[in-house]
Structures are given as structure tokens and as C-alpha cells.
Amino acid sequence: WGCGGNMTPEYYANEYRRYQTYVRNYHPDRPIKKICCGANVADYYWTKGVLNTAFDHAEQWHGFMDGLSLHYYVHPEGWEIKGSSTDFDADVWYKTLSKALYMETLIERHGAIMDEYDPDKKVGMIVDEWGTWYTCEPGTNPGFLYQQNTVRDALVAGITLNIFNKHSDRVKMAALAQMVNVL
């Protein structure tokens, strides 16, 4: 789905099953974890399609995976115009926090789909991209995706980490994108 891949969930899952075969554990003390590309935000169709195909005739519970990823960014003004990281009013402040709370809905709904295929929760939800994402700061290189963080971002992080903790039976790993992807 992402970065121009333009794949259907079924096609991707078949490709995933094919190529994961060649990713093997070579050291018993350092097992490789296979993470399947999951949904962007509320694309429940993707989650259902990938799991349905990946788990079809799969050995026992795992659908050839240890985790399924999920991406969600909080951008208060929308994807095209994300809003300023430092110049915002109270309305945008509350809108940002409200959108942070949406992470719980995403985890619950994607988790419910995962439960259909993996009721024992052996496949982890891997929220490998999350956080706030605003319009690049004026005067900075847009390719570097620099944004100044504020107390508002700390509250988004606190809300989100609390949600992850609450759903730790399914969420097994999370990566704040600003730490990993230089936002």
C-alpha cells in the first residue's frame, strides 16, 4: 500500500509468504522476527485481506509472521496541510489530543480482526510508525522533515504510550517515528 507499492492485500500477502521463506534463523540465541506490512491508519480492509491470505493453510497459528505493523500519525489539520508544530491555538491543541486518542480505536479494531486469525495473540501488533507530523518548519530543508516538538507533543506521546500499555496483550512493539524516521 505504501510508498507507491500499489498492491492489493492479497497480492502483498502472497509475496510476503513467498519471500519470508528465505528469512531463516541462523542463530538460536538471536531469533529473527518476521513483521508483515500492516495497515496505514484505518485500512481494515488491508488487515483483513493480508491476514486471510497469510493464514490460509498456514502452519498452526502464525500465518508465517511474528508481527503485523500499523502506522498512525497525528496531524491536526489533515494530511495535505498538517499544521504548524509551534504556531497553534487552543482549538488545534484539543484537536491534536483528540486525534491522539484515536490510536485506541485503531488498536481495538485492527486487534479484533487479528483476533479472528490469532485468538491467542501470538502475532504482535507492531506500531512501527506513530507520533505527530506537522508541516516542515519554515527555513528548513523539507527533505529533512524537521519539526520542533512542544509540550503538546509530549502529551500526545503520553496518551499514546498509555494506550499501548493498556493493549500490551496485542501491541508488542512501537516506534516513535520521530526517533526513527527523522520527523
PLM region descriptions:
Residues 9-161, 167:
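Noncatalytic carbohydrate-binding groove/subsite architecture in carbohydrate-active enzymes
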Residues 157-183:
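Catalytic cores of secreted or luminal carbohydrate-active enzymes
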Residues 1-3:
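Hydrophobic or amphipathic alpha-helical targeting/insertion segments
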